[in-house]
Structure formats: C-alpha cells, structure tokens
Design a protein with these regions (language model features):
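Feature for intrinsically disordered/low-complexity regulatory segments and propeptides
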Residues: 1-91
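Intrinsic disorder/low-complexity polar-acidic segments
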Residues: 90-328
C-alpha cells in the first residue's frame, strides 16, 4: 500500500495509522525524540510450580522512553539488531553531508506508526529534476531516498533511492526509476552505514551519469569475470620477489578480500542479477563498510571511506572494467 503524505503544514500531523512531520533539516530528529526512543528491558516469566519469577535472559522487552511505556510486541532475542530510527537517520544525514548532495536543498518527510515501532523517512532533493517516460506534460520527478525501519520485527530494514513519484514496501516504485534498493533483516550482520552509503552513491551516479548506470544494469557480469577484474585491480598485492613466496608461481592476490567481495557480489545479484551494476554495488558496499576498522589506532572512518572510494574508482576505470562495459 502506498504511503499517504500530508503536505499542508510544517508541524506534527496525524496521518492514517500514525504521525508525520515535514521539514528541511536532515539533522532534525524531533519527531523521533518526542515519540520513539527505545531501550531493552528484562523479561520475566512466572514459574508455576514454585510461583517465582524467572528472568528470560535471552530475550528482552522494549520500553519506549519517550512515551513512558512498554511496547505491546513480542520479546526480541539477544541476537536481534535493534536499530533505532534516530541512529539510522543520523547516519543518513552524515553520509549525505559528505556526498555531492551536501549543498542541495532537501525536503524531509518523517513518519511514525504504531506507537513509534515503525518509521519511514523520505528525503527529497528538491532542486534536482529528472525526466521519466510518460505521456503527461510534466514528466519531471524529484530524486529521493526512502528508508523503512521497525523495532518489532514487522519490517525489514529497507532502503530505496532514485527518481520516482510513489513506492511500496514490496520493492515496487511508480512513475520513475530506482537507482538502488536493498532490504535486510535485523540480524547481527545488518550493516546500516554500508546500505545507506550505497543508496547515496547510487543516487549520485543516477543523477550525474544515468545512461552509464543503465548500461551497467543491462551488462551481464558473472562471478568468474568479476573475480578476474578484482585479481588484476583491487585484490592485487604489490609485487614481491619470487623468493618471498613459498610457491614461486603463487599469484600475489589478497584472497580474503577477494572472497569477501565475491560473497557480496552474490548478495547484490539476488536483487540486481549478475550484472556490472551488481559488481559496482559490491564494491561500494566494501568502500562504505568500515565496521572492521573501528577502534583501530590511528584509523578514522571518513579517511578509510575516502581511501576505499579512491580504490573503487581505480577498479571502474581499469582496462578490464572499461572493456567489459564497452565504455570509451
């Protein structure tokens, strides 16, 4: 079902099933601060034989601090990745500010549903326009990024970016085109910064090089060909003397990174097919996925991200990549 967005006022508005708030500040989290601040609390069960309360240590209830009440929902397990709405949207704001969209005017629509358990944020880049194929006189649509999140296991964490008029959570968009879409369950492996980073980078490319992006989305790339490109670029180690190798014929390849990128390529291919666009998204996932570097001495996340983006740029401008994509 399509979301109904009210456009008439600039305060908190009542919409079907919840509340909405329209504003122009990526850092404005007032709706979530007022209605959706969560924390885990213990769950106890009554032991009937001895009439005692037992702590279910592997599960938690969720307390809405903003509303001062326990949410009516199933307990969540200790492996459930409880992503707060505010932390996800703060991360999005930071990455947009670090992107080519940092000086663009935005319109933000925040929505909360069911006592704050579900959230949907849309960021419109209002001074950008893209034409779409239609019979109407006004074919221009505004590029946007949509994020869906829940804290009660009802919605997966899901991101769309592109230029389209409407969308629904079953991955369809209407009146336009997606640049990026991905959804993940709230498991320990959910990497919110990486997903947000890919949505922003994909929209940047959609805005600046839409024809190239469409070419990549149509061009077939199998895992073997992708691995060949990686061995000659990103995963290629510096040259060493043959005496440094246990086997003189061993190829100087970072096998761990190669395996990681191929695994990510398989994940991207589930949504995008075995295409060059899936390969590019696997590369951008790595360039924005810096969790493994957190806490290391003298390593700053933004520096790591910039360095990796430069390395991705080297891959997509390499002879193997350009030849595959038939880009002059």
């Amino acid at each position: 079902m399509l979301d109904i967005v009210e456009n008439s006022t600039n305060g908190f508005n009542v919409i079907r099933g919840g509340m909405s708030y329209k504003h122009n500040d990526l850092r404005d989290m007032s709706l979530y601060k007022a209605y959706a601040k969560f924390e885990r609390i213990p769950v106890f069960a009554n032991e009937p034989v001895f009439d005692t309360m037992e702590n279910l240590s592997d599960y938690s209830a969720v307390f809405n601090v903003a509303l001062g009440r326990v949410l009516n929902m199933r307990p969540i397990s200790k492996t459930y990745n409880l992503v707060s709405h505010q932390s996800a949207f703060d991360e999005q704001a930071k990455q947009i500010e670090d992107s080519n969209f940092d000086d663009r005017r935005v319109e933000v629509v925040d929505r909360l549903f069911e006592d704050g358990k579900k959230a949907h944020r849309t960021v419109y880049f209002t001074d950008l326009k893209h034409d779409i194929n239609s019979r109407s006189i006004d074919d221009a649509v505004v590029p946007r990024i949509d994020i869906y999140n829940s804290i009660d296991m009802s919605w997966a964490f899901q991101i769309f970016s592109g230029a389209y008029r409407d969308l629904c959570r079953n991955s369809l968009v209407f009146g336009g085109q997606k640049a990026y879409h991905q959804k993940r369950k709230h498991t320990r492996g959910l990497d919110v910064p990486a997903m947000i980073g890919k949505s922003v980078l994909s929209l940047e490319m959609f805005d600046a090089q839409r024809d190239l992006m469409n070419n990549w989305a149509r061009t077939i790339l199998d895992a073997e060909s992708f691995a060949h490109i990686l061995r000659n670029t990103l995963c290629k180690k510096p040259e060493k003397k043959s005496a440094d190798y246990i086997r003189p014929d061993a190829r100087p390849v970072n096998e761990k990174l190669l395996e990681y990128l191929l695994e990510q390529f398989f994940e991207e291919s589930k949504e995008l097919g075995e295409t060059v666009w899936a390969g590019y998204n696997a590369l951008t996932h790595w360039s924005t996925h810096t969790i493994e570097a957190r806490g290391k001495e003298n390593q700053k996340q933004h520096d790591i991200r910039r360095k990796r983006q430069d390395e991705v740029r080297d891959v997509i401008t390499s002879p193997d990549w350009l030849s595959l994509c038939e880009v002059a």
